[in-house]
Amino acid sequence: MLSLDNAMTADDLKNFEKRLRNFLGSSGNNIEYCIEPKIDGLSVNLIYENGKLVSAATRGNGKVGEVITSNIRTINDIPEKIDFKNTPSLMEIRGEIFMTKDDFVVLNKSSNNQFANPRNAAAGSLRQIDPKVTAKRPLKFISHGFGQIRGRKHETYYDQMLQLKKWKIPISPLMNKSNSIDGLIDIYSDIVSKRANIPYDIDGLVYKVNNLSLQDRLGFVGKAP
């Protein structure tokens, strides 16, 4: 799991698309993008084998993370078993553990140890030595991607994320897609206008090339997909 690069302005987005088109050549015409809010929480990696959750870890340094399987099993949003027809034999699901703003306020009122913000509360709750303590904390999970999915059938990130939703894995209700930079900017403006009413903290948006084959061709530049 790698960290994401930053684009701060509309010109940054346009320059990003220009670099993509230069790299992809004729394949770079009409690039479609998927957009999701970046939740301010703790990034985790879940591994399912034959539909069963077998391990979970934090992002750590991008290569090695802290194993938190027992604590992850206490979070209601994360299914212990995915029991649907044609469930892949191996799935790597990436997402964010977080706490809503309202739940954070309630937790701080009832706790002797005050947390500075919802992100710290989520991280501290997830890293408890005793899973029973974690189980009492109001932690949530939303997936923001995937690694290996054996036998993957979908050609786009958007469609694969909708498949995760069918498997009862939570995804962002604000996920969207666009085939233009102007469309990305419009979606950004719309989400910013709603930000105060989003029940959890976000610290930006993530734009991804929607076509998974193009993603594979583009690979990674430094630490930025």
What are these regions (language model features)?
Residues M1-P225:
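RNA/tRNA-interacting regions in translation and RNA-turnover enzymes
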